[in-house]
Amino acid sequence: MRDESPYVFVDGKKTDKNPFKDIRVRQALYQAIDIKTLQRAVMRGFSIPNGTIVSSETNGWSAKAADRLPYDPQAAKKLLAEAGYPNGFEFTLDCPNNRYINDEAIGKALAGMWAKIGVKVKVNAIPRANYFPKVLRYDSSVGMVGWGASTQDALFPLQSLVETVALKKGNG
């Protein structure tokens, strides 16, 4: 994770500090997501919530790891304050608008949920032909991805999405 993130602002000013490096910030955003509302209103019941990036149909999936933290905006606000962002912060969420089912709608719904805890999000929904090159150039602070394990093994999405970037070593 980078020390600086290109599209993050605190009190209206660009910051050199990347708030996403703090686990409390990431947990706050996670706990501010009302997954049941996303499932009902955005996905119209055609989704299966999961607490991990590994699908339940994939070797290596763990029911324990798939448990989600509860939706709790008050806990999220407290975590942000503890992390040094009592008034929240701003960032741009880049997402495709023609790659995943309801991708842009999900991005907008997340922005609305995060606004309730003081985090202002600009949703930059763009065609996938522009989105993926932007993300691969590291010209994004936060992006949306979906991933399937064509090998049916958890290693594939974990290595592709979670592995630390080490370009000189040729991985990440």
Q: What are these language model-derived features?
A:
Residues 1-42, 48, 58-172:
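Extracytoplasmic/periplasmic ligand-capture domains
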Residues 51-53:
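Extracytoplasmic/secretory soluble proteins
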